[in-house]
Amino acid sequence: MSTTSFAWVALTLAGVIAVTAATTAQAQEAVAGSAEAGAQKVGVCLACHGPNGNSVNPEWPSLAGQNAHYVREQLRLFRAAHRSNVVMAAQATALTDQDIADVAAYYATQTPAGLEADPSYWKAGEALYRGGDRERNIPSCKACHGPVGLGNPAAGYPALRAQHAVYTIGQLKQYAADARYVDAAGVQQKSRNGHMMTTISKRLSEEDMRNLGSYIQGLR
């Protein structure tokens, strides 16, 4: 398969999934979110996710600028125990649909803090993020997450820009180990884009993950 054909297939696949995901997302957005109301509800979130959604601990994700569709979906998964995390499960259980909508709307309006990419790794990360690897059937990350990591809000693809490299690497490893979307008993659960990310992550080496994590951290 030529490079052009490979890119076309990757983009076509992303487009088909985006249409399906967008339809699902629209059905889930029946409750309108208020960023102003969300600002009054994120007090407990600050301890881990930082002021204005910019985490200071690289183990915990920054949420500033994350698209609301994605935050809603993840909070619902935590609430339903379809994504296992002791801290998040406890917090999400108490949230109503309105709370989730408001919190998601708030974080979507916040500005990501600028982080720097590790100069030792970001070049290789850029090549994989933007061009993929045809020989290993790894599509470019930008096909779904955009050239500067803004994601695709309508399709539910998350923004990646300025995310901590440590967190990104950890999530890629979870996908590769079939551990990203599991319940407390370790049973695999469904998610909108989980299967695609699991398939791709299994093709990544630890070096690939490190390079991608560094490049993504430096995206603006």
Indicate residue ranges for each PLM-predicted region:
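Bacterial N-terminal signal peptides that target proteins for export
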Residues: M1-T12
